[in-house]
């Protein structure tokens, strides 16, 4: 898996300062996509060492966001972050309509689902097909459970429905 570039944003994940890693070789090729440069298999290999380097060189972030990527490998990287960087949140943008079965949601704090459909708009449009989920983790009797809560409306302008 490779990435083209990174950016630090304040808007991709609510209330977070996120290091967003733009993963290439996107399989979805959504019409009207704002990042068609991510369709090709180009860029820098995203190894665990490279991920550590990116995190360490972006002090002050509160979240790492993977913008695309293979579910199996994203899950491995998310698990690594969860174990090594206490308190750092993890998000993933996935163009599929469901969370893949290979994903352990316990490794994530945010997951965005849904391919981009130009006529429905992005997360900031109340008519969007895309959904942003916050993963709520609870530990009871030593067992962690994780559930999803739809927080898509946090992206809408106040009063929109």
Residue ranges and their predicted role:
Residues 29-38, 59-61:
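Short, basic/glycine-rich phosphate-binding loops at helix/coil junctions
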Residues 38, 69, 115-116:
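Flexible loop residues that form catalytic
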Residues 20-33, 70:
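Cysteine-centered iron-sulfur cluster-binding motifs in ferredoxin-type domains/subunits
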Residues 60-80, 124-130, 137:
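Conserved glycine-rich "GG(E/T)P / GGGxP" loop and the immediately following alpha-helix
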Residues 18, 63-65, 89-91, 110:
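Structural preference for beta-strand elements that scaffold enzyme active sites
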Residues 40-53, 71-106:
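Canonical radical SAM enzyme core domain
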Residues 1-22, 35-40, 154-161:
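N-terminal [4Fe-4S]-dependent radical SAM core
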Residues 105-161:
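Classical nucleotidyltransferase
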